[in-house]
Each structure stands twice: as C-alpha cells, then as structure tokens.
Amino acid sequence: MQPQFVLVGFLVLLGLGQNARGAEPADPVAFKHARVIDVWEAYADRLTFGQGQTLALLDDGCKLSLPEWSQSDGDLPKVRVSYDSVDDDDDPKHEGRGYHGSTIGIPSSVNYKGKRGVAFNNQVAVVRALECCHCNVSDSKTLAAGLQWVIDHHERHRITAINLAPVDDLEHAEPVATVIDAKLKRLRELGIWVSAPAGNHNFSKGISWPACQPNCFAIGAVKPGKDEVHLDRHAKLDLVVPASATSSSNAIVCGTVLLLREAIDKSGYDWKQDGPNRAAAMLTILQKTGTEVHDPTSQLTFRRLDVKAALDHVFERGRR
C-alpha cells in the first residue's frame, strides 16, 4: 500500500475516533431512532447546534452545582440565567418535593465530558415555577408567573423555546382553563415554542395538564428503537418521539426545534407557508416530515419525530 494512502486512512480513522469520543448521545437508542445522530454528522459544517439560543426549562427547580450545569464543554456557561417564580428570586434550588428539574434538560442541552444533548451548544434558562413536577392546576399561578418572566426576558436572553415540564397525571380530554392560558397565547404569538409531556399512565382518553391546553404542543412517545406508541396518547397529541418517558420525549423535541430554527434562518426557508407564526410553522414541518405511526389502542395515527427529514426538508427548499 502506498504511504500516502496509509496516511489518509490513519487520519480518517483518527477523525472517526475523535468524533466517537467527543459525541456520546445523552440517549443513544432514542437519538438514533429520531435521527439526531444523523443530523450531527450531516450538518456538522452548517449548524452550530444551538449556539446563540436559550431553552427555558420550567420545572420544579434545579441543583445548579451539578457538573452538567456548572460546567460545559462549550464556549459559554450552560446556564445563562435562573429565576424562581414561586419565591420571586434568582435561586431555583429544589424545595419540598422538587427533584425533576435537575435532569430534565439533559436530553436537550447537556454538553459535559463528551455527553451531548440534541442542541448541545445551547444555553438554558432555569425557571423554578412550582414545588414538584407532579403538579395540580392550583400551581397555575406560579407557572403563569414563570411564563410571564420568559415573555418579559426572552429578547434579552435569546429564549426561543420553553420546555414546560410539569404533568398533573390526570386524563384530560378537554382543556382546563387557568391563568396560564393567556401567557401561552402570547408566547405563541411571539413565535416561541412551548411544549409539554403528555404523561406516563397509558391513558388513551386524555392527557395531562398543561399539555392539554391550547397553544401548548403535546408530546407523546414511542418505544425507543421501535415505532410503537406507549404511555399517554390522545387526539390532542401533536407529535410522538422515541423515549421511555414523555418528559424525555418532550426534552428531545425541545432541543430539535432549536436546530430547526437555526436551519430555517440559515437556509432562508419561507416558514410562513407552514403557519401563522414560527412555532406553529415548525410543528407543521415536524409533522409532515415525520414517520406515520398507527396506534391500535386509540385507533389514531401519529407522526413520529424524524429530525434529519425535517432539516433536509428545510435546507432543500431554502432560498440561500
């Protein structure tokens, strides 16, 4: 074999090894199924994977000293800003029964010791908006305050999406009117993505609040590695995503929409053909490029997230 070919082969193998070591998916099976890993490879030279965007995590607080949040392999601190709408201060530490918010941002955002979330170069805004993610509609007041904080500060902190993480673990076939509804409506008008997990109880006649509300996208799940709908499902579901829990499926799609927004901006894609605002248009893109999955339990057909297909659609039809 000629020396130059040996050298080229060595460099290729070296590069592949570095990529493998430097990009451990936060959820390998789910990321492969949703084609997140394909996107990392295909668009490595075109996307920054979240740089310049902030994802707001509205949950039950966070232990900010955890290395996943206090350290980052990226150029910027992972946590850009924090707020507690329960106590009206900037310390979102867990109190009472809180626990969930310390991990909910991992699938979307982690960038620590080689482990990566979908949009690993993003920043997060940690908002403690209630005591525990397993909530009640009585938590709507502090949730509304957290949403209002995002409305007031989204431009300063470049917040483009919200992971509205709580679930009330009930089977709502219809919306439940509360004070969060006006905030959700305003966020939709601003084009800010807001989605929530459907719930994890195998309900088929309804889903959890606040996912059941207008202007909040409801995210369900398929089993990782298999297009089989599981956990809560209902006609209200907007999208299903590979994950073992709907909180994780919602986290994955929240990271995805940061990539999709960047792709729209860089390609010059005319999103207005898909919806009246950026958030609605992005859902349309994710739905029409997603894989059809029929659910025998509910007799409904859902669209399963295919991140690569969504980005391909945008770049192939862009004006730049």
Language model segments and positions:
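Catalytic-core regions built around general acid/base machinery
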Residues: H172-V194, W209
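Boundary at the C-terminal end of the N-terminal hydrophobic targeting segment
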Residues: G17-G22
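C-terminal subdomain of the subtilisin-like protease fold in secreted/lumenal serine endopeptidases
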Residues: R35, H157-P166, E262-R320
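Extracellular S/T/G-rich loop segment that most often corresponds to the catalytic His/Ser-adjacent loop
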Residues: D59, I192, G206-S267
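Solvent-exposed loop/turn segments at secondary-structure junctions
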Residues: D60-L64, L130-H134, V167-H172, N200-S204, ...
